[in-house]
């Protein structure tokens, strides 16, 4: 029997085409969180209006649930905000001559009284208690930022930049009924200090100001990604025209949730090779009340199972009133069919039986998932599915999907089968977080670190420019370091056309995406004779992202043991080679094995001193325990020479019960 460690390790990418287990069936019924539902609801609304922008951060008026009127807005300002603003203005006047204007000027026709119903609501909310909500109400968040902006204006330039950038972007959020008096005060400060902003300094610390900015990240607007807007627009156009859509967007930018939005106007067949992806989509869809069917490991259409929401005919338990048995042969109500690649043809004919083919979209997730193998059991299944497909609308979705010119045979085959078919390519490089690549030595990998010749650099830049989704894997900190160095040393560039002022005119331009694109521009226009100097300089300036763990093999220190021993899973020996040193020629893997130790084990004083061994440098090998603190702000890719051994060790050391 597999232990939890072995199960987790061996099932990270399960491509087995089999039926769902009882546990997997039960898992889809677990509702997702409210925040996730808000995002899903926005995606569904976005299908009908792709310009939708929502923000759940409450303003004072929306929190108090009071109608928005000019007199009420003025009253809110005077009761809750004016005293805070006046204190800040008084402090600012000691150092700056800012011209503040009274935000509310009474007119003759302005109403001067508040409705009794609104008075009752105001009386129910004590002023002191409202002001305690400074971390959640929009106006108080802005005033907190203005206070810190004034505080650090002369004391700490780095913090001042941080709060200016944060205030600038927070003031532009789409909040329901923000107080205009507070916004006017904020804009007056931003305008006054505008000339103090140094774009180069903003870029230099962009990893703090953008990627690690909890204010901007927590209170950000909810809106569709650009690639989702294009997908929805294309699918709504010319509904009778066949379409092949090549959908290329970075991982974790909502591609897998897009079918839920598409189901607002179409019937969806979602095809996935990895079962956990389909199970996850089923969970999200059911949480939003979508009517789904599941087809995993199906030999015939009789193996397809409907969720209760999609059931049309069924029998009930006469005692409990709950559904007892569903007639799975009737799929009139199915909105989303979720299937593995083995069951696609069964699902396709099943859906075509109840719905017009022109209104069905086959949404194929990761169609190239096994194509890096010379041969694979899935290859024949994929070929048969493509050959026998009768659905005229297909979306091929993957972050690494080949470009249209690289798969012309596929495109022409689709056009030959569906006359007049439109071919669309959606390419996006939207991302909110970077996924840095860290090598076994603990350093971040970037193009300017790995391209040791100008020819390699040119080839790398051509590839990155053609596949901008790769920008996701550029570490923002290292990107900014390189950019700032070339800004300060323009002699390495071919000409002055690439000066920072031509690319960044204001703070709206200082985004993660633009900084990384500017990085590509600079790298692409470095002088050929200057590249060896630049390459050597940055090799010497490399910084550890994960610092070495200097340990002596065979010695127990505070932390984890590196000595050779047996690695056991629930009492069963799992032999494998020690990951910290090479196996001598002629030796067996059993001679050098791992042992799991308690994560904070101390050396006993009575233990005899062991013979000192050479110090081993193990950068980040404890990513699942004591090195985990280095993996901040999202996922990280860790490159290992032997993935299996490192993976087993990390899972073992995690000590998951």
Per-segment meaning from a language model:
Residues 1-657:
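N-terminal helicase ATP-binding lobe
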